[in-house]
Design a protein with these regions (language model features):
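N-terminal core-binding DNA-recognition domain of tyrosine recombinases/integrases
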Residues: 12-25, 34-111, 126
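Basic, Lys/Arg- and aromatic-enriched nucleic-acid-binding interface segment
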Residues: 99-151, 155
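Catalytic-site neighborhood detector that most strongly recognizes the C-terminal catalytic loop/helix
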Residues: 114, 171-175, 213-215, 277-302
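Short, basic (Lys/Arg/His-rich) helix/loop patches that form interaction surfaces
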Residues: 129, 225, 234-275
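Conserved tyrosine-mediated DNA breakage-rejoining catalytic core shared by Y-recombinases
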Residues: 156-192
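Short, polar N-cap/turn motifs at the start of nucleic acid-interacting alpha helices
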Residues: 160-166, 246-248, 268-289, 313-315
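DNA/chromatin major-groove-contacting recognition/catalytic segments
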Residues: 181-184, 193, 290-315
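Active-site/catalytic core of tyrosine-dependent DNA strand-transfer enzymes
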Residues: 183-247
Length: 315
């Protein structure tokens, strides 16, 4: 017999498990999807039988009319699908063929997040005439110079990751081992952001003064602190863009996408870009592609930096 609130209970159980594993970011996404769908259904106790093909279709239309972007809608739908499939595997939900067939679960590549070379040059090199914005500019510049490193990875770098002139770390999102050579142009910026916090036993000794080193790695308080730091960085990045008179929208993703777009424009193979970003795959072809040496990836990174640094509008 199916529980009347089985879908919600299944979701909450999985969200709780993610939190116990310290996967607070993933748990947060599932929680948002569940909250949104529950609100649409008009109840906090959604049953599996309420998850129908027609209701999902209408829910997707509702999200679109609320102004959500296709990729956000897709994320919600994929979270709901994952929860439903867990219910099916547990024998708590009926198997319904093509249940999510009428809703969007792809990735809209039209939602471009990269800046043009000219805008990127302004963002990273023009004087914002503000110490607060200059610090934001330094963080953005390091993200770009570290092969389009994500803000999450940059903020969570520990001092032990810096091995002479190479950063060695595991990506926060995928746990993929990464190595990035520190270019000479980054050394001064590293010193400016260096964290002087005293290390605390069993707590991360962060490299940069972005997060406090007084919380254990999987503590939910540490996740909340990171979310606060991310919001602050995004807000200040927008302030920086306004101060430099940029018209394009910017966010923490902008530097990562702009690094990849710059490399693609320069003719760098997609396989090299994927590996430099720490992506797990680029379709099935990457399964048999040889890994690129650090030296090769460093040359790509140097080329990207030189291209943007020396870029001049109207050339």
């Amino acid at each position: 017999m199916m529980n009347r609130n089985g879908f919600s209970r299944c979701a909450e159980f999985y969200i709780g498990r993610l939190r116990k594993e310290g996967r607070h970011s993933t748990a947060h996404v599932y929680k948002n999807a569940l909250f949104s769908f529950s609100k649409y259904c008009g109840t906090s106790n959604v049953s599996f039988r309420q998850v129908t093909r027609e209701r999902l279709r209408r829910y997707g239309q509702y999200l679109y009319e609320c102004g959500l972007k296709p990729n956000t809608i897709s994320t919600y739908m994929r979270m709901l699908r994952s929860i439903y499939n867990r219910g099916v595997e547990a024998g708590s939900a009926p198997y319904v063929p093509r249940l999510f067939h009428d809703v969007y679960t792809g990735v809209d590549v039209r939602q471009k997040k990269a800046l043009s070379a000219g805008e990127l040059h302004k963002l990273l090199y023009e004087d914002p005439k503000s110490e607060r914005l200059r610090r934001t500019q330094i963080i953005a510049a390091l993200m770009f110079q570290f092969c389009g490193m994500s803000f999450a990875d940059l903020a969570h770098l520990e001092k032990s990751a810096l091995d002479q002139s190479v950063l060695r770390y595991n990506r926060i999102k995928t746990k993929t081992p990464m190595s990035v050579e520190v270019l000479d142009t980054a050394r001064g910026m590293i010193n400016q952001l260096w964290s002087n916090q005293e290390p605390i036993p069993d707590c991360p000794d962060y490299l940069f003064d972005i997060l406090c080193s007084n919380k254990k790695r999987k503590d939910e308080r540490a996740y909340r602190e990171y979310q606060s730091a991310l919001r602050r960085f995004n807000n200040r990045l927008k302030d920086l863009a306004r101060a430099l008179r940029l018209n394009s929208p910017v966010s923490s993703y902008t530097l990562r996408h702009s690094w990849a777009t710059t490399a693609k424009y320069r003719g760098v193979p997609i396989e090299m870009i994927s590996e430099s970003l720490g992506h797990k795959s680029i379709k099935t072809t990457q399964i048999y592609l040889k890994g690129f040496e650090l030296r090769e990836r460093t040359e790509v990174n140097k080329g990207n930096l030189s291209y943007i640094r020396n870029f001049r509008l109207g050339r």
